[in-house]
Amino acid sequence: MAKIQLNGKKVVIKSNFSLFDLLKKYKLVNKKVAIEHNGKIIQKINFKNKLLKNNDKIEIVHFIGGG
């Protein structure tokens, strides 16, 4: 288990949890999102490879249309 900070809230996740797993957990896989991992923007192609560790800080922004 690991404790991370997700959009300012403390969250406990399983070991070997990737950014993609986090998106699945919050039902954001098919949404347009930007993810910041410890202050760096992560490209979508790296979501499955980027494993989360204890004390990581994650910010997820998803875009919604409107008019």
Residue positions per predicted region:
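Eukaryote-biased recognition of intrinsically disordered, low-complexity regulatory segments
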Residues: 1-9
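Short, basic/aromatic beta-hairpin or loop at an interaction surface
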Residues: 27-38
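Short acidic beta-strand-loop surface patches of small beta-rich interaction domains
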Residues: 36-49
